[in-house]
Amino acid sequence: LHPSNIHDNAYAIGAIDFTGDMPVILGPDGPSLGGFVCPAVVVNAELWKLGQLRPGDTVRFHRLSLAQAGEREAAVEAALSSLAGALPATPSDDADAHTTPVIYEDPAREDVPAMVVRQAGDRYVLLEFGPLVLDIELRLRVHVLMTALKDLQAQGQLPGIIDMTPGIRSLQVHFDPALIARDALLKVLIATEAALPPVDDMVVPSRTVHLPLSWDDPQTKLAIEKYMQSVRPDAPWCPSNIEFIRRINGLDSIHEVFKIVFEAPYLVLGLGDVYLGAPVATPLDPRQRLVTTKYNPARTWTPENAVGIGGAYLCVYGMEGPGGYQFVGRTLQMWNRWRHGEAGSVFEQPWLLRFFDQIRFYPVSQDELLRIRADFPHGGYALRTEEGSFSLKDYRRFLADNAASIAAFKATQQVAFEAERERWAAAGLAEVASEADVEAAGPDSEIDLPEGGRLIATSVPGNVWKVAVSEGQQVQAGDVLMVIESMKMEFNLLAPASATVHKLMCAQGGSVAAGQNVLVLIDEAV
């Protein structure tokens, strides 16, 4: 329902990522890929500035050309090598630079999908295939291309490639411009893609990995409660994400949601979707593809290994952090911090899953899951896996044989989706608080202060977790006035001196911006 949602693709370091109405800049500790649109990327030479930012700072973006980015990189490297003085000034804004991110387009021809290549900052290019739809054939084409490029790397014919990350219908190539120029890389990509064999008869290895799932786990319920208390109490997906999934998909009961989740084989299309080997997967059978919108605004906290659905995709969160997928439960670890490298074990690498694995869930109680989670990283729980393969020819036959029932399911689903949209509009839930609403009480707003009045502002953006005082109350220096929750941390807002609380300017559970005025104190001496 939100225009920021896209089919998951890779994220560049420095990408400006619009997660619903909340933009963030992704650093080197950010996710490998995700399902939100990224309209721009901070160039490599300017990434150091992200580490200098603090709550309350204002960020202004300047548009640079690729040539300017290269010049800036050279100037910064020279300054660091000599340490002779301050870093050179940032190049001036180039209004004509990169009016479009598209650097190459190849239209569809016969059985070959269209390809678009986009610039992503100065060190990445993103190749996208076909229309904006979920199509497993497009993912297979991405796989064939990545395999061909890796072969060129192994033969020493493609220097300067740092990494490649596949998405649902895309491949992001991270390169070092000191070793291979963007235009030279583009020529290799175009030639390699043009020479790809057809995927018609493609068969890829596909294990079935059986994972325990604690349905509607208490930790996911806690995350929903925290969200309702501190972010958005009236969100349509609260208080039950599972009920929301049922409603928006036109299912008759929560048991139908349960049945689909536990019967569907989920094909892993990407890894690192929200950190640490986390899979993004979708059911092979379109009749089992539950579709949801994501949280807006996003959650500030998600339990490790929570299982959720966003768009048509399922994700297992690799670690605690923000998130937006609708919860169905919780499973075991996707990433092993303690034990890996054993040949033949499920953790030959730190990450558990592989591309094109098929996940099958089986139900366990919350207590069983806690025991499994305690034992699994240390080799104390045997995970059941079965070797197999995925054949595109067989899959096409399955889709053709079931075309009528698939179309009927999608039609019912679409009717329910539109009905949900209308409910939101009727209830006034289609829009959340705008930036203007937050800025209304910002540092530049006009407020009539009484004599001796003092404005108290929060230095961090977040949500008002607790209002500890009331109007007219006497406070002493150091008393807690409010508790602000920001990115999983709680910040106490303290009284600077003995005073009386004159006016509260925000409510418990509301959102606040860095620098926003939240209450007025009258100093005791007045």
Regions found by a protein language model. Give the residues of each.
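Conserved "landmark" site that anchors the functional core of diverse proteins
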Residues: L1-A440
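A generic structural motif
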Residues: D17, T331, A468, E485-E490, ...
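Short histidine-centered loop motifs in beta-beta connectors
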Residues: E46, G51, S345-V346, W465-Q474, ...
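Short, flexible surface segments
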Residues: P55, P303, F355, E471, ...
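Short hydrophobic beta/alpha edge segments that flank linear recognition/processing sites
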Residues: G56, Q473-L494, A513-V526
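Generic structural signal for buried aliphatic residues
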Residues: V59-R60, V307, I359-R360, V464, ...
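Short beta-turn/strand-loop junction motif enriched in small, turn-promoting residues
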Residues: A312-V316, S470, M489
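Acidic, low-complexity mobile loops and tails
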Residues: V438-M482, N492, S498
